[in-house]
């Protein structure tokens, strides 16, 4: 017997989307000029940590449900797992744009306090050489690229770790996708620029 699909009430909201709205309020505190600067940085960090765990737990569960032969629907809005994942990704894209704007604001407000984050292309030639030497000595020896191909299984990705995705050129002129682990236990998140006190990259 086919199950009857219930029509969602207009006042009902999907739990996952409701949670993203909550996390947006955390992000709003990071952008609130009435909140002390140090606390705003904390709110920005909490927002991202919350989002990482949300994707790890809740989105991971929805992805598992999508693999099931039975269509699973959320009991308040009648959304399928696939519909929920799409809605979550769409909402997250909007939040990412908002987060980028707030991040730039925070970085701008940190500069008068003597703390600066700088992009590599804004370094002088000498500073660039110093960081290239640092990369060659302190980072490159620990890098190990996992090539994505049909011949190899997709690499296992650890939770709450940072990975870089790169396109590698082959001798034949083609490109291959590689995933590079960037462990927090091996690499420093911030590298200070010796020639500019209080400046990091």
Q: What kind of feature is each model-predicted range?
A:
Residues 2-201:
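N-terminal non-catalytic structural scaffold regions of very large proteins
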